[in-house]
Amino acid sequence: MSKATCSFEGCHSAVITINDDNIINLPEQVHSEFKLLENRTMRDATPSESNFLVVPDVWDFDNVGVSREIPSSILGDLSDKSDFVFEYGNSSWKIKKCLKYLICADCDKGPIGIICKVQDQTKNEERVLHLLSLRSLQIMGRN
């Protein structure tokens, strides 16, 4: 199993063990839209999609910090963003609103992910998920 760690020099704190079944792809523009940190080596690769780890519960992390609520003036309304739809748990989910940022709990740097309100596109049910940007972290032990 691979581990996601903080990518900042002098930190490298373990953030979470990665479950490959919970990795989703979102469009490339998600990093600029949500103002997420990008690991320099990953940013230079310029892939067309970005991998995120879906984490259902904050207690599933080994070590993560959470910011204050993100003012809507920073990110705006996402209801018209049809690009931010992903498949997870046999459902199609749409990101409705970003609530808070995820940061490294040891060095307080980031943001390395977002806590989002998402909506199931078929059942019309809403829930909160943690989306951890794998491009914002260093991945150890990946084959």
From Swiss-Prot:
What's an example GO cellular component term for this entry? cytosol
Q: Could you confirm whether the keyword Hydrolase appears in this record?
A: no
SUPFAM superfamilies registered for this protein in UniProt: Mss4-like (SSF51316)
Please give the Gene Ontology molecular function terms for this protein.
guanyl-nucleotide exchange factor activity; zinc ion binding
- Which InterPro entries does this UniProt record tie to the protein? Mss4, Mss4-like_sf, Mss4/transl-control_tumour
Q: Which domain of life is it from?
A: Eukaryota
What residue stretches are annotated with the MSS4 domain? 1-131
Disulphide bonds in the chain: none
Q: Which residues bind Zn(2+)?
A: 6, 11, 104, 107
Alphabetical GO biological process terms: post-Golgi vesicle-mediated transport; protein transport; small GTPase-mediated signal transduction
| Keywords of the record | Guanine-nucleotide releasing factor, Metal-binding, Protein transport, Transport, Zinc
UniProt similarity note: Belongs to the DSS4/MSS4 family.
Another remark in the UniProt entry says: Present with 1500 molecules/cell in log phase SD medium.
Q: What is this protein called?
A: Protein DSS4
* Species annotation: Saccharomyces cerevisiae (strain ATCC 204508 / S288c) (Baker's yeast)
